[in-house]
């Protein structure tokens, strides 16, 4: 049984990765219903939280049915990060996660996200201070290193563990790679095989088929953190679990299942943000829910341009009739 501190999360847990503009409460809840063992929020700016920015504060919303759920924060200023932790703690997450892996320029340029891979002393200092600040278990998501010449993930993992981190998720690329090339899980395996390590080590990056999840398990890693493969496909977690258990594949989601999922997503988004914003927020998911269906473009266009829930539901009914 894998544990994050005292939280039991299964023998080989599947975690939903924090993804900006994707991992909102409705999507997380759907992934949880479909096999995700732990879910993480979109990353939240520590500076935004302490400014009381609405865009940051709403990312702290969680449903009880999501638990265990982690709220991920990012930043490079110690005082701001500690104040952000105080704010986050009031929302009662099960886990607080620190983002030391985002490769995006606007984050990295401030020394946050993967930018901190250039300053491991600051990484350790921030982690240790956050762990001391909160009673909530602290985890970290990071990358192999800044570039191919500075891959220090074994050292990084040791230092994070020494600082009190309760689990680490590692994306198998460097910052300079962004999302190009293949994720290299062998470095993550080295972290797990380090006799000094005793906290869970999760692999992330390119785990987009059940077979690849099996490879992660075969490497002896504690679990898999799944990101892009789940977009438009919350069923992926159950597909992976079924394959790990039976070595067979579940049939792909039918049109009726896709329509039902899109409808539920919209309903939850409306319940979360109201009709106007709920309709708007769900638009970005339709292309992925109906990906690969021939001649779907006219229906997708209607779904992403409709402003009223009734119009979206009408289009979804037509999809059922036509396909």
Predicted regions and their residues:
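Alpha/beta catalytic cores of nucleotide-metabolism and tRNA/nucleoside-modifying enzymes
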Residues: 1-5, 10, 20, 25-26, ...
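Glycine-rich, positively charged N-terminal anion/phosphate-binding segment
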Residues: 1-5, 10, 19-94
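N-terminal small/glycine-rich loop or linker at the start of catalytic domains
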Residues: 2-15, 47-68, 102, 108-110, ...
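Hydrophobic faces of well-ordered beta-strands that scaffold small-molecule active sites
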Residues: 14-17, 39-41, 69-73, 96, ...
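Active-site beta-loop-alpha junctions enriched in small/polar residues
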Residues: 19-21, 44-46, 74-76, 101-103, ...
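Alpha/beta enzyme core
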Residues: 82-112, 121-199
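Aromatic- and acidic-residue-enriched carbohydrate-binding clefts of CAZyme catalytic domains
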Residues: 117
